[in-house]
Amino acid sequence: MRTWLSITLVVFTIVARADGPADNIVEKVRSVPPPGAKIPDDVRNELRDGADKLRKEIDSLRDNLKGKSNALALLPDIEIYHKAVDWALRFDEILNPTNEIPAARVLLKQGMERVQQLRDGKPVWNSATGLVVRGYVSRLDGSVQPYGLVVPATFQSNNPREWRLDVWFHGRDEKLTELNFLTQRQKDPGQFTPRNTIVLHTYGRYCNGQKLAGEVDLFEALADVRKNYAIDDNRILVRGFSLGGAACWQIAAHYPGHWAAAAPGAGFSETADFLKVFQNEKVQPTWFEQKLWHQYDATDYALNFFNLPTVAYSGEIDGQKQAADMMAKAMAAEQLELTHIIGPQTRHAYHPASKLEINRRIDSIAAQGRDPLPKRVRFTTWTLRYNTCSWLRIDRLGKHWERAKVTAEIDENTLRIESENATALSVVMAPGLCPFDAANRIRVVIDGKELAGPRVPSDKSWDVNFHKLGGRWYVGEPHEEGTVKRNGLQGPIDDAFMSSFLVVRPTGTTAHEKIGAWVNTELAHFTNEWRRHFRGEARVKDDTAVTDADIASNNLILWGDPASNRLLSKIGPKLPIAWAAQQVKVGRKDFTASQNVPALIYPNPLNPDRYVVLNSGFTIREYDYLNNARQVPKLPDWAIIDVSTPPNSRWPGKIADAGFFGERWELTDRR
């Protein structure tokens, strides 16, 4: 359904850079973020001294607060100020000295004020209204990450009421350092500030459309907000415009049971057509890249909008109207109709009358809230990374990167399920929510086969597993030996960087000098790019210093070869790709070890609940930074990299071979 509104236009600008054909040249890639500007030495020294002083005060405060967990939990709210200025100086990220030098002084002053407040036991920001910036420590890399809040004037910290929360995803801004983000979030409340609503502005680890580590940032920031504010779980909404609209599409599509509503504006919703239309790029993906588009193409998850009220917006003459048009087409194929508000004769901005109409609809949906137990769920996925919608969970797939589809419906005391490409399912209804009659057994019909479900316990919960064996469904968990692909342990390589990870560098010498040089270059490239693009410093240890506790709590990112990295040598015989001094063997294929390096992800033989990765960081590279629609995993579960071809802005070398492991993490020839 398209709704057209006409009124005199007031333009709301969105910070963005116009991408185009100039950004389609692999050999000529500009820097993102851009290079910093030169600042006077006396100003640099002044800010450096201020940041160092703030760091010392934070460290002293941490010592003084030992044993006071509630107060210690507030330290990230101070550390965000230090990081913002410290990083701007250390990494030459003062981009506009006229604005950012005064802003840095303000942030240092605010950081010192919070130090004093916390030392006095009066952290006033914890109960403040208006524009508030806060932070949390990420489990991924131990870094401090910021977020902004708009706290309504009606908020009272001692009031037990639960608040509606709207999450706002920001647009593309290549200059959005922590310094600029904190400054913006203390000046600009944003496009939408509904009454009696807390608005969360995520940083998203810079400029990635809430993908990969940026996706994790949403949930970590949300968890931190919940610690400090009483949030109504059934009235959390997601919104965004431009790159934020793209983020909204993908977060809504992958997590449809989490939110009360979604309101994406502009942006993009898939990779191939957007790059063709908006970027004028001739896209020629490898077969595995094309499969990996299924991770973030929201169009592939269009069915999931059956479960989530959604109001899309586009300007009539905005090139990014393409995003909602593509979603409308994909939803129509699922017999769904997209509500699409269109601002007449409007480019890349919100039309004021359209904003009113969006608010009318979204506020009405929010007043109803999310249904915690819908009678019917229709859910699709391509990977177990995204496996849950409301009370339905897909636990195993027949084959990753092919579509799985499940429809589940409650019909009085019968549960009916129809499935495709799913081999294990769970139904999880929280205490008090199960609608079935506790006095009778529940009838379950899966793909036409009738099963007897367990009775409802006295707390009115219901948690039941189903598995498929030999083409038939049974009640209970699957009986499995060895490792299998499951949620959080399904690949591809980039998945290792969506939970806590530890980089393990080699202390020995590689068997081949060329391999050693490549390892050193790519390890440095990864740690530098993680800092620049995911705004954290990767934790790094020598292979000789890794402890049992490290192995228990982290994905291990091993660099080197069996000769140079003792951990790689230890686990190597248990990996499906054999790596000897002269040869790398992948099934029946052999590669010369003097010029080929395996990169892979696999359940860690030393801790099968965590990953081990060989010789790879996250797989998007500098070319992909230039348009966010390119920021999709580039390598599958394993790859053989021919290092005789030097790394460039797209690849770590020539990809001699690559593929996905099967559902039992076995080598397979299937594509």
Q: Predicted segment positions?
A:
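Solvent-exposed alpha-helical segments and adjacent loops
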Residues: 416, 427-671
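Active-site machinery of serine-nucleophile hydrolases
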Residues: 162-229
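Short beta-strand immediately N-terminal to the catalytic nucleophile in serine-hydrolase-like folds
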Residues: 238-240, 263-265, 313
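A domain-start/cap signature at the N-terminus of enzymes
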Residues: 20-37, 91-163
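Mobile cap/lid helix-loop segments that gate and shape the active-site cleft of serine hydrolases
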Residues: 171-184, 257-303, 307-308
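Amphipathic, heptad-repeat alpha-helical segments
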Residues: 20-78
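C-terminal catalytic histidine-bearing segment of alpha/beta-hydrolase fold enzymes
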Residues: 313, 317-415, 420-421
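Gly/Ser-rich "nucleophile elbow"/oxyanion-hole loop immediately N-terminal to the catalytic nucleophile
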Residues: 154-161, 211-243, 253-259, 304
